[in-house]
Amino acid sequence: MKTPKMNVESFNLDHTKVKAPYVRVADRKKGVNGDLIVKYDVRFKQPNQDHMDMPSLHSLEHLVAEIIRNHASYVVDWSPMGCQTGFYLTVLNHDNYTEILEVLEKTMQDVLKATEVPASNEKQCGWAANHTLEGAKDLARAFLDKRAEWSEVGV
């Protein structure tokens, strides 16, 4: 039975045929003024088999959102997937996949050196009690350990 085409790109992805971890271009959009938006699927865990626990995911979200901008001025957003298996990285007017992988690698290396989770307080975060620096580092370390496989999506 054929699955109907959905409006959301990731809903059209056969999650049974991917092999995490990976980084893939999930979408490209051209704006009316010529700007290019590229959205990357940065998958940490195998869909429907594993997921990131919320405190670790939440902390990694904060760390990467802050640190990645030290390496790339074109980053628009780093946001977690609701399924807790990965993140979306959105960039503006940048379309170099190899450079994105390098930026992600540098960012994850910096996560491993972090001494605190940025903005993990009640003034700057909506769930400040839900953080673990060590959990975020474990996720970053596992992702980096498979660096050679990031381009192998499996679809």
Curated annotation (Swiss-Prot):
It catalyses: S-(5-deoxy-D-ribos-5-yl)-L-homocysteine = (S)-4,5-dihydroxypentane-2,3-dione + L-homocysteine. Its cofactor is Fe cation. One of its GO terms (cellular component) is cytosol. The keyword Cell membrane does not apply. Disulfide bonds: none annotated. GO terms for biological process: L-methionine salvage from S-adenosylmethionine; quorum sensing. InterPro entries: LuxS_sf (IPR037005), Metalloenz_LuxS/M16 (IPR011249), S-ribosylhomocysteinase (IPR003815). Binds 1 Fe cation per subunit. The keyword Lyase applies. HAMAP family: LuxS. Belongs to the LuxS family. This is S-ribosylhomocysteine lyase. It comes from Helicobacter pylori (strain ATCC 700392 / 26695). The lineage of its organism: Bacteria, Pseudomonadati, Campylobacterota, Epsilonproteobacteria, Campylobacterales. The gene is luxS.
